[in-house]
Amino acid sequence: CDRRQRQMCIRDRYTLDAFRKILPVLPKDCIISDIASVKTGLKKFYEESGFRYVSSHPMFGPTFASLSNLSSENAIIISEGDHLGKIFFKDLYQTLRLNIFEYTFDEHDETVAYSLSIPFVSTFVFAAVMKHQEAPGTTFKKHMAIAKGLLSEDDYLLQEILFNPRTPGQVTNIRTELKNLLEIIENKDAEGMKKYLTKIREKIKSVSYTHLRAHETRR
């Protein structure tokens, strides 16, 4: 405020409580902001606060990202935020060489449901059914490393990401694919397996993040 910055480092679950405690002592010309992964309730809070605001989400963390080279990592800036606030975070994220995208709150929640809940649920299932291996293969070890990293995250953060209203639809898609794959395996359907592998290989080839450039922040 008054060209000074005040920062608080808190867990996502305390974001709204922290804002409610400090707003009474902030000048009305302040821009309040968050970089929370979980934005449940933030849009309504901001709109009723009487303050200008900016909200963003760096889509990476210290568990898996290489913090010395973030050029392959992404950050989302919420489009409903204050213009000057968005410029501040755009400049900051450009300095870190992040790929910057501008989404609405709803688009952010949809992205989180897709890009976080699918790998989270898949990893949880792996961890739930795995057992000790004396001589694990490379793929198993890589999955284990991912599971250990993910499960080291805060319980509340994992819960809130999975409790996103859009997550059940993604989990239903996983369940459908598992059902289809199980039928192929149980029936020893070689032709079905060949078609399935062809389908998912083509899907991986077709997955491109360039389509997100339509939302990319102008630089």
Q: What does each model-identified segment do?
A:
Residues 5, 57, 108, 117-120, ...:
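Histidine-centered active-site/metal-ligand motif
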Residues 102-208:
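An accessory alpha-helical subdomain
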Residues 1-6, 10, 209-219:
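Single conserved hydrophobic/aromatic residue that forms the stacking wall/gate
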Residues 38-99, 109:
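Rossmann-fold dinucleotide-binding core
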